[in-house]
């Protein structure tokens, strides 16, 4: 049986089960849009897209992006997919005296508690997450929110 035929059959079964699927094709289209916006802003970013299991589907490194941003972008996508919330929202819940204080020390330190990670949905169902790193906190947060909006409009 043809591999593409199998992939289409699996995607159809998942859709019928009421689940959303993050495909490599969707991830690449999203990354392209976020990269263009980052270029407009003068940001050299690393952009990561994860599936609902918080596993990377695609990672893109813009030229001259910070080396450390690679793991940070992956971990932002991991955090948003794994906790089903943006990393900006998590930052509110993870401060001193808040219910999730200290969560960044779990999961082998992969939980990120600052902006740049967003949950991605298709028709109200979670398909995965986006992580962006390389700019300021505000730039990463903006680019991730932009990516979420673009994705949900049908990348």
Give, region by region, the residue ranges found by the protein language model.
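Flexible, solvent-exposed loop/hinge segments and secondary-structure transition points
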Residues: 2-155
């Amino acid at each position: 049986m043809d591999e593409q035929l199998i992939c289409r059959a699996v995607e159809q079964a998942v859709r019928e089960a009421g689940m959303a699927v993050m495909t490599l094709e969707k991830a690449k289209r999203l990354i392209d849009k976020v990269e263009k916006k980052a270029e407009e802003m003068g940001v050299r970013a690393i952009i990561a897209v994860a599936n609902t299991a918080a596993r990377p589907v695609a990672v893109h490194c813009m030229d001259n992006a910070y080396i450390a941003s690679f793991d940070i972008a992956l971990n932002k996508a991991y955090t948003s997919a794994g906790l089903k919330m943006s990393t900006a929202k998590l930052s509110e819940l993870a401060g001193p005296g808040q219910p999730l204080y200290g969560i960044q020390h779990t999961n082998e330190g992969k939980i990120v508690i600052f902006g740049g990670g967003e949950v991605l949905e298709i028709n109200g169902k979670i398909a995965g997450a986006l992580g962006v790193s390389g700019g300021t906190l505000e730039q990463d947060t903006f680019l991730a929110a932009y990516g979420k909006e673009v994705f949900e409009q049908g990348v």
